[in-house]
């Protein structure tokens, strides 16, 4: 029989920049997990993705050991990077603040595919397109 799971923690952290300070410290500290070891492992595994927010799902076991799974960056972060903007529009229906090409949309959809509830790239593109629309980003055909 495997180890008994005592906690599942989901965090969204900047790649390569996890520190024992909040939010990591309090989230893992309550389970007695080794915070410094997590930070070192996370930073090592995300070193090539600096500048992106990488969500992580941490499973903490009874013996205080842990394992974690890295997810893909949120669609909004990828869209902001592609459109070269700092934040979404306050009025996405009337004020467009950037645009991306159909190829960029497809690349983002392919990146997000493993975390979306579809295996079809066209459907994934529709999901990401909806996020872009809500951010005030125009898709150029």
Curated annotation (Swiss-Prot):
Pfam families: Ribosomal_L11 (PF00298), Ribosomal_L11_N (PF03946)
Gene Ontology CC terms, in alphabetical order: chloroplast; cytosolic large ribosomal subunit
CDD domains: Ribosomal_L11
Entry superkingdom: Eukaryota
Keywords, in A-Z order: Chloroplast, Plastid, Ribonucleoprotein, Ribosomal protein, RNA-binding, rRNA-binding
Gene Ontology BP term (one): translation
Leader peptide range in chain numbering: none
Intracellular or extracellular location(s): Plastid, Chloroplast
GO MF annotation: an example: structural constituent of ribosome
InterPro entries, per database record: Ribosomal_uL11 (IPR000911), Ribosomal_uL11_bac-typ (IPR006519), Ribosomal_uL11_C (IPR020783), Ribosomal_uL11_C_sf (IPR036769), Ribosomal_uL11_CS (IPR020785), Ribosomal_uL11_N (IPR020784), Ribosomal_uL11_N_sf (IPR036796)
Similarity remark: Belongs to the universal ribosomal protein uL11 family.
Functional note: Forms part of the ribosomal stalk which helps the ribosome interact with GTP-bound translation factors.
Quaternary structure, from the entry: Part of the ribosomal stalk of the 50S ribosomal subunit. Interacts with L10 and the large rRNA to form the base of the stalk. L10 forms an elongated spine to which L12 dimers bind in a sequential fashion forming a multimeric L10(L12)X complex.
NCBIfam families: L11_bact
PANTHER family per the UniProt record, alphabetical: 60S RIBOSOMAL PROTEIN L12, LARGE RIBOSOMAL SUBUNIT PROTEIN UL11M
Record protein name field: Large ribosomal subunit protein uL11c
Gene (UniProt): rpl11
């Amino acid at each position: 029989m495997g180890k008994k799971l005592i906690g599942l923690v989901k965090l969204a952290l900047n790649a390569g920049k996890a520190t024992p300070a909040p939010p990591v410290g309090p989230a893992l500290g309550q389970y007695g997990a080794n915070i410094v070891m997590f930070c070192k492992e996370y930073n090592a595994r995300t070193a090539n993705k600096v500048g992106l927010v990488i969500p992580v799902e941490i499973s903490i076991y009874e013996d205080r050991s842990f394992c974690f799974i890295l997810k893909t960056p949120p669609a909004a972060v990828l869209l902001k990077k592609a459109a070269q903007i700092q934040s979404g529009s306050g009025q996405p229906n009337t004020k467009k603040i950037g645009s991306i090409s159909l190829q960029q949309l497809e690349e983002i959809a392919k990146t997000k595919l493993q975390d979306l509830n579809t295996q079809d790239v066209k459907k994934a593109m529709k999901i990401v397109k909806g996020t872009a629309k809500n951010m005030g980003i125009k898709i150029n055909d």
